[in-house]
Amino acid sequence: FDIRGVLDRGPSFKPYSGTAYNSLAPKGAPNPSQWEQAKTGRGVDQNQKETRTYGVAHWRYNITKTGAGVDQNQKETRTYGEPTGDITLQKKAKEGLQIGIDETKEDQTTKFMQIKTFQPEPQIGENNWQDTNVFYGGRALKKETKMKPCYGSFARPTNKKGGQAKVLTTEDGQPTENFDIDLAFFDIPQAGGNGNLDPDMILYAENVNLETPDTHVVYKPGKDDASSAANLTQQSMPNRPNYIGFRDNFVGLMYYNSTGNMGVLAGQASQLNAVVDLQDRNTELSYQLLLDSLGDRTRYFSMWNSAVDSYDPDVRIIENHGVEDELPNYCFPLDGTGTNATYQGVEPDNAQGQNDKWKKDEKVAAQNQICKGNIYAMEINLQANLWKSFLYSNVALYLPDSFKYTPANVTLPTNTNTYEYMNGRVAAPSLVDAYVNIGARWSLDPMDNVNPFNHHRNAGLRYRSMLLGNGRYVPFHIQVPQKFFAIKNLLLLPGSYTYEWNFRKDVNMILQSSLGN
């Protein structure tokens, strides 16, 4: 018989660990953001507000050498650099960044080709290690978009190029053709006044539909959700994985059929229970023997959707003999050099009366980037972190609620059975630190007694969840064949089993979840 239907696994369904959005971002790194705060400084009206920006100008536009009086045929020796150029294009910076050149036009110095709805693109950064006179550009979130950590952040696209800015609306709420994007200009602070101010940096500030679908905040320094300097340091954590699938669906029961369906909850015609006749004795015994030789119920049988609950052994029993971390693990900057400074080329001044003096070497560039000392590096204990991370994800998060606490400034639902509440509660890291270097085999009591099979490393549950697919709303179709699981070493009485003995299969449509039922 067949069972068909559509299943809504609910908003807590999450068939993966971690996050699908900005998963490589540090968990405490903010999105480039703006916020508003009171002005600071002597003689400033404290009631006045000013906008502050924290961001990254990742996109670099190199300017070619177009200065007056420059011989383009002359060459100069550079160390980790390239010829500098004058900032002739800064006068047009108010139009934005020049992303490309329109080769069909003659005057190529005025063609600012950026489309501000999606350019500069956040995934495009520097394409050269050399430092030049350049414009830098990037994107930032306006103060109206409430800050969230970059880890786990998602904003749905609002145009076909992938831009995420909101569409501006009229006073009556009707959408317009314009997007909520403004240009913010920045320059190096000038000593002693407003002279010589030219923007070196342009940020495209926008409001977006910012969401965090599969993460939650676990460190929140400010009580308010609004954008602020304090909320720059929020830290996120992924929501727990939650596989949801049908339990072992079909329970076999052999009973004697006295033609009146005595002892059966429902008759054969009602189809609430599937009652099928056995074959003759030889056929049935041969089929049982075949099934027994093929495998047992700890295998995965997708035909019956009956994968048996099975833990990862490391989850139930902690075998701890320390971590193999004898070798240090280093990481280095991408350019392989680290922090560098710009140096001018010089040479001895051999002019009359200039002994022991030096002069600018006109054959060497003014910008030579040179690093001093060791390459900048950081060390991390990879093995210890992997072990601790495993223990926290697989042991600490599944401990009883009494072992956990609510982070400061985080408000959780009063219903302790909700997915949001379970995710918001965190366990002290010291709970799993205690297992490092014990050198023993531990069977944790909560893992055996508190929902022992509701765990994301339950391979049977995970498999049954995968059979339904990775969507929240899923159509399902379970086909149960006429031949069912055989009972090993079944003792059959003499007689014709075609009419006297039947298997009844109870349709067990109970859902199982990694968070508990």
Curated annotation (Swiss-Prot):
It is found in: Virion; Host nucleus. One of its GO terms (biological process) is symbiont entry into host cell. SUPFAM superfamilies: Group II dsDNA viruses VP. Pfam families: Adeno_hexon. Gene3D superfamilies: Adenovirus Type 2 Hexon, domain 1, Hexon Major Viral Coat Protein, domain 3. Its main location: virion. Residues 1-48 are annotated as: Disordered. InterPro entries: Adenovirus_Pll_hexon_N (IPR016107), Adenovirus_Pll_hexon_sub3 (IPR016110), VP_dsDNA_II (IPR016112). The keyword S-adenosyl-L-methionine does not apply. The keyword Zinc-finger does not apply. GO terms for cellular component: host cell; host cell nucleus; T=25 icosahedral viral capsid. Keywords: Capsid protein, Cytoplasmic inwards viral transport, Host nucleus, Host-virus interaction, Late protein, Microtubular inwards viral transport, T=25 icosahedral capsid protein, Virion, Virus entry into host cell. Major capsid protein that self-associates to form 240 hexon trimers, each in the shape of a hexagon, building most of the pseudo T=25 capsid. Assembled into trimeric units with the help of the chaperone shutoff protein. Transported by pre-protein VI to the nucleus where it associates with other structural proteins to form an empty capsid. Might be involved, through its interaction with host dyneins, in the intracellular microtubule-dependent transport of incoming viral capsid to the nucleus. Belongs to the adenoviridae hexon protein family. Homotrimer. Interacts with the capsid vertex protein; this interaction binds the peripentonal hexons to the neighboring penton base. Interacts with the hexon-linking protein; this interaction tethers the hexons surrounding the penton to those situated in the central plate of the facet. Interacts with the hexon-interlacing protein; this interaction lashes the hexons together. Interacts with host dyneins DYNC1LI1 and DYNC1I2; this interaction might be involved in intracellular microtubule-dependent transport of incoming viral capsid. This is Hexon protein. It comes from Human adenovirus D serotype 8.
